[in-house]
Structures are given as structure tokens and as C-alpha cells.
């Protein structure tokens, strides 16, 4: 018997990456998983390397970043890899979620996979926010102040929780220390959740396919077919990431963060990283602080409603024209929210943000179930002819 199939550890690798049977018709849209695994590996390796040279102290944090950039051998490369791969990570995660929404990957028996994926997304956002604070530039300090202050919206105990998180009465040395500790440990928890995500997928029904039908009729092994298919997109990903790292490393960042944190001077606009902008826009669209915070967290958790609200008989939207149109309208609306999150809080951006927020929640609560029922009815009427 081959060692791959007899060794207690290697047979696990074999069952997941070599002999795992996959539907023969899955497209390149199913390659995001391997790309996201690459992103996580890059982030952990570069993150641990950066941690060796970083000083989590309000007096030294900004200077330690400059030390990494100027004095550490290839420190600039490690830092730019870390910051740009974070953007790539979120870009690919949004594509991964969009593919799952379009092809109905949240439907039974993969509901647990979808739920674990949602937890991974929330943890990613928390990790990214903590990491954005660490360079301790202007946007780091004021971003941390604004976002942590959201917790003060909780009645009675909110302000006490905020001061507990800060370790004082404002963002200070204790805050930076605990943010660094959490930012270091969360990616490893994320890696454990990714393994749970894979186990849940492997032990339920395996990968879905573009037709939304059972893939048991025609399956092929993961290696060498999909292994080489994944390698193609991995090489493309490395090429695109390299073009950002070497030629435009700061294009996705904020120039304000190259100014040392100054508690006495507020930046002209406090804006989070681009991948958090849609949820920031939803937060700002609601005048009430507590309701805005609830709406922001609900916007992330809203994707958990899809297994319940999608009542369509066919899996996925590829054969459902009304739902397909609504899905692409939702994608456009999400991009509009992303743009609005970077705009100043003034007319007409406030009104546009409120309209986009209403549409965002309407999609999950009303549009998906109503269109599902209409399409089911149209199928029934056609069948009765």
C-alpha cells in the first residue's frame, strides 16, 4: 500500500488534496479557495517576520515601521507584501462570497460550511482593523478611536467597555500592546477556522458545481487535474500581487498614515481601508448611533439569512433570470456603498447611502424570498400547460 494511504497524517493530506473526488465541471470560480489559502500563508509568514522587528509602544511604533522599511534587509518587501496581500485577501473573499451567493453554495447540505465562512469573514475584519492600528500613523490612531468608540453605543455599560478595551481614557500604550497581541494570535485562530471550513465541506457533500445538480454522476480526482488548474490561478495571482508590491505599493493605502499619530490634530476625513468601506457607509447612513452600529453588524451577518430566505427550487441563480438580475443589482449597490464610505458626510451622499442601505437589507429580507416564490410559481404554471 502506498505510504500516502497508510500513514496516519499523510492519508489525511491524500484524502483532501490528492484523491479527493470533485465534480468534473467546476470552473475557475472554484479556485478562490486555494488563492485564499495562499493569502493566509503569506500573511502569517510576513506577519511573524514583521513582529520580530516591530515595537508595540506609542513612542516607538511609528519609528519601528520606518526602521523595518529602511534598515531591515528586504523589510520594505515584507511590509508591502503584508499590506497588499491583506487587500488581495479581502478582494478574493468578496469574490468567493459572491460566487457562493450566485451558485447557491449556502443551500443544504453546505449550510454549516457557509456559517463557518461567515465567522471567518468577521474574524478577518477584526484582524484587519487591529493591524491597521499598529503602524500608529494619523489614520491608525483616529480610526482606532472612532471604531472602538462605537461600543459606547451599548446602553449603560458601553463607555466602561470602551475604557476597558483602551486600558485608559483614550487610545494609549496599553491599547497598542493589546491590539498587537490580538493581531498576532488571531490569524492562527483564523487558520484553525479555515481547517474547520474544509472539514465541513469535505464531510458534507464536497464542492458544488456550476449547474447546481448532484456531482456524483461524473467526478475526477483533485490531483493532478484541479491541482494544476489551481496552480494557473496561483501564478496569475502572484503576478498581479507582485505588480502592486513592486510598482504601486501604497495605492490602496492612505497617505495620512505616513504622518505620526497626533492626538491633538484630527485628520480631514477618517476613512477605514477600502474593504471595510461598504459597512462603514451603512454605519454612517443611520443618524442614531446605536441603530447605526446594529445595522453595520447586521449587514455582515445578513448573509446568514440566505439559507432561510432563498425558497427557490433550483440551486443557484444560473437558471433564474429574476433572481440573477437582483443579484447583479445587489453587487452594483455594494460597490456604490464602497464608494460612499469614502465620501464626506454631506448631501447627496447621505441620501444615496440611506437608499443603498435600504436596498442592501431588502435584498436579503424581501427580494430573495419574493423572487424565489415568483419563479417557483412561473415554473408551476409552465408545467401545468
Curated annotation (Swiss-Prot):
Catalysed conversion reaction: a quinol + 2 Fe(III)-[cytochrome c](out) = a quinone + 2 Fe(II)-[cytochrome c](out) + 2 H(+)(out)
Major enzyme class: translocase
GO biological-process terms attached to the record: mitochondrial electron transport, ubiquinol to cytochrome c
Residues reported to bind heme b b562: 82, 183
Residue ranges crossing the lipid bilayer per the database entry: 28-51, 75-102, 111-135, 173-205, 225-247, 289-309, 321-341, 349-365
E.C. number(s) listed in UniProt: 7.1.1.8
Cellular localization per UniProt: Mitochondrion inner membrane
Broad class of the protein's primary localization: mitochondrion
UniProt KW keywords: Electron transport, Heme, Iron, Membrane, Metal-binding, Mitochondrion, Mitochondrion inner membrane, Respiratory chain, Translocase, Transmembrane, Transmembrane helix, Transport, Ubiquinone
Mitochondrial matrix side: 1-27, 103-110, 206-224, 310-320, 366-385
Required cofactor(s): heme b
Membrane topology: Multi-pass membrane protein
CDD domains in the record: cytochrome_b_C (cd00290), Cytochrome_b_N (cd00284)
Record-listed heme b b566 binding positions: 96, 197
Coiled-coil spans in chain: none
PROSITE patterns attached to this UniProt entry: CYTB_CTER, CYTB_NTER
Record InterPro entries: Cyt_b/b6_C, Cyt_b/b6_C_sf, Cyt_b/b6_N, Cytb/b6-like_sf, Cytochrome_b, Cytochrome_b_C_euk/bac, Cytochrome_b_N_euk/bac, Di-haem_cyt_TM
GO cellular component: membrane; mitochondrial inner membrane; respiratory chain complex III
Signal peptide boundaries: none
List of residues binding a ubiquinone: 16, 202
GO molecular function terms noted in the UniProt entry: metal ion binding; ubiquinol-cytochrome-c reductase activity
Family: Belongs to the cytochrome b family.
Note: Heme 1 (or BL or b562) is low-potential and absorbs at about 562 nm, and heme 2 (or BH or b566) is high-potential and absorbs at about 566 nm.
Protein name per the record: Cytochrome b
Organism: Neurospora crassa (strain ATCC 24698 / 74-OR23-1A / CBS 708.71 / DSM 1257 / FGSC 987)
Chain's gene name: cob
Amino acid at each position: 500500500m502506498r505510504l500516502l494511504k497508510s500513514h496516519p497524517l499523510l492519508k489525511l493530506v491524500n484524502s483532501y488534496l490528492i484523491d479527493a473526488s470533485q465534480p468534473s465541471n467546476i470552473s475557475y470560480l472554484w479556485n478562490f479557495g486555494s488563492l485564499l489559502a495562499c493569502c493566509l500563508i503569506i500573511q502569517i509568514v510576513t506577519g511573524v517576520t514583521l513582529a520580530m522587528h516591530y515595537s508595540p509602544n506609542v513612542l516607538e511604533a511609528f519609528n519601528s515601521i520606518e526602521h523595518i522599511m529602511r534598515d531591515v534587509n528586504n523589510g520594505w518587501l515584507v511590509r508591502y507584501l503584508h499590506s497588499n496581500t491583506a487587500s488581495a485577501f479581502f478582494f478574493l473573499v468578496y469574490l468567493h462570497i459572491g460566487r457562493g451567493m450566485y451558485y447557491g453554495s449556502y443551500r443544504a447540505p453546505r449550510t454549516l460550511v457557509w456559517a463557518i465562512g461567515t465567522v471567518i469573514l468577521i474574524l478577518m475584519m477584526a484582524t484587519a482593523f487591529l493591524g491597521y492600528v499598529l503602524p500608529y500613523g494619523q489614520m491608525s490612531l483616529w480610526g482606532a478611536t472612532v471604531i472602538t468608540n462605537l461600543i459606547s453605543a451599548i446602553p449603560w455599560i458601553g463607555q466602561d467597555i470602551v475604557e476597558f478595551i483602551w486600558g485608559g481614557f483614550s487610545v494609549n500604550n496599553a491599547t497598542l500592546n493589546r491590539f498587537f497581541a490580538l493581531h498576532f494570535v488571531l490569524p492562527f485562530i483564523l487558520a484553525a477556522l479555515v481547517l474547520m471550513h474544509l472539514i465541513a465541506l469535505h464531510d458534507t457533500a464536497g464542492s458544488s458545481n456550476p449547474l447546481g445538480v448532484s456531482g456524483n454522476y461524473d467526478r475526477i480526482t483533485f490531483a493532478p487535474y484541479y491541482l494544476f488548474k489551481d496552480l494557473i490561478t496561483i501564478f496569475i495571482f502572484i503576478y498581479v500581487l507582485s505588480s502592486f508590491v513592486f510598482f504601486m505599493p501604497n495605492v490602496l493605502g492612505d497617505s495620512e498614515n505616513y504622518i505620526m499619530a497626533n492626538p491633538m490634530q484630527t485628520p480631514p476625513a477618517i476613512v477605514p481601508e477600502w474593504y471595510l468601506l461598504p459597512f462603514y457607509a451603512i454605519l454612517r447612513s443611520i443618524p442614531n448611533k446605536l441603530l447605526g452600529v446594529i445595522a453595520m453588524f447586521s449587514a455582515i451577518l445578513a448573509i446568514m439569512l440566505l439559507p432561510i430566505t432563498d425558497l427557490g427550487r433550483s440551486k443557484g441563480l444560473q437558471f433564474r433570470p429574476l433572481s440573477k438580475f437582483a443579484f447583479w443589482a445587489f453587487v452594483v449597490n455594494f460597490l456604490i456603498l464602497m464608494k460612499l464610505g469614502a465620501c464626506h458626510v454631506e448631501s447627496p451622499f447621505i441620501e444615496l447611502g440611506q437608499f443603498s442601505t435600504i436596498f442592501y437589507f431588502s435584498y436579503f429580507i424581501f427580494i430573495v424570498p419574493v423572487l424565489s416564490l415568483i419563479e417557483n410559481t412561473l415554473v408551476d404554471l409552465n408545467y401545468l400547460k
